[in-house]
Amino acid sequence: LFYAQPLLQYNGPRMTSKIWSGYCLDVWGDAGKEVILMGIGFETTTPTVAAAILSARRRGVDNFSVFSVHKTVPQAIRALIEDPELRIDGFICPGHVSVITGVEAYRMIPKAGRAAVITGFEPVDLLVGVLGAVRQLEAGQAEVQNAYERAVTFEGNLPAQKIMNTVFEPVDRK
């Protein structure tokens, strides 16, 4: 094997990309250098970042920070509903997010007269979702249909919601 020697030595900040927030805390949290985790994502990633923050607090790690740019799917949908230039008749709601939020999080969709179907990501799941939305629209109905019952409950993942609400405070990013 041939290993190239770097021509320049870089001694500045180190950046690494990790998909698990606990890794940043476990590997770098006690290294003596400032660790800044950029928390990106929706309800599916937010609970793990919240858990890392609480773990850092419990362990007394003071060099671990989070720059959170998390978003919430229900608020994104609300913004789409409230935009007067958009005329969206229905929504296919993401199953992975809905596992956390539950069906209940989408109650504003039928209140706005729009169809909504929660689906998984398999092709047949998506087709069932589109069919469900079309049937609602043809019947003049507006409801939240859970077509992903094998994973999504009405109330969602309450422990995940609790940890998110303990650590993060929703703010408007307009």
Predicted segments — roles?
Residues D26-M38, A52:
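Membrane-interface helix-loop-helix junctions at boundaries between adjacent transmembrane segments
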Residues R14, V66, A116-I118:
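Conserved beta-strand scaffold positions in the cores of enzyme catalytic domains, especially
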Residues E143-K174:
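Active-site loops and adjacent core secondary-structure elements that bind or stabilize anionic groups
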Residues E85-F154:
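A conserved active-site cap/scaffold subdomain adjacent to cofactor or substrate pockets
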Residues W20-C24, T48-A56, I77-L80, I109, ...:
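Buried hydrophobic packing segments
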Residues F2-G29, V73-P74:
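Glycine-rich oxoanion-binding loops at beta->alpha junctions
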Residues N11, G32, V61-N63, R87-I88, ...:
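A generic structural signal for alpha->beta connector loops
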Residues M38, F42-A105:
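Phosphate/pyrophosphate-binding betaalpha-module
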